[in-house]
Amino acid sequence: MIKMNDITRDGNPVLRKRAEKLTFPLDPKYLKVADEMMEYLKNSQDPAIAEKYHLRAGVGLAAPQIGLSIQMASVLVPGPDNTIDLEETLVNPVIVSQSVQIAALEEGEGCLSVDKDVPGYVPRHDRITVRYQTLDGEEKTIKLRDYPAIVCQHEIDHLKGTLFYDHINKENPLDIEDNAILIG
């Protein structure tokens, strides 16, 4: 079970490396890692388990965040009324198209690997199309918008060695395009 002390923190060089592409069939150790990453997300979103193990809530976890420089990220995005908008482990994900429309989270972004609060808007594309492989090696393409799109962009950034605060305007953190959508 992944716990907070297993999360790689900002400052560790693995978070700034471009992760290695995975080949199929996946090594069984990577299948176990994928299960553990998704388990962390589920546990972190369960108030009782999160409190018991002192887990910070997360909607995404990329392999570099647990010290593995491989192109794999798990996402578990809750929807309305206890539904799930997106539950998937993405292997070798690539954003193949993106909207011109910019969006950002109204409250800014956070990250399990970044312990400090970093205020500011993180401009992202409101709609994206992601091509990736499943844990079985099947190639899939999904179209995402709004919050799930932002979550996937954040996790894919981890695979490129980019952290969310790299996108924040250094001069004026609350500056964003006039027509940007703020997602609250």
Curated annotation (Swiss-Prot):
Note on how the cofactor is bound: Binds 1 Fe(2+) ion.
Cited Pfam families: Pep_deformylase (PF01327)
GO molecular function, one term: metal ion binding
Alphabetical UniProt keywords: Hydrolase, Iron, Metal-binding, Protein biosynthesis
Active site positions: 155
Catalytic activities: N-terminal N-formyl-L-methionyl-[peptide] + H2O = N-terminal L-methionyl-[peptide] + formate
Domain of life: Bacteria
Family as reported in the entry's similarity comment: Belongs to the polypeptide deformylase family.
Name recorded for this polypeptide: Peptide deformylase
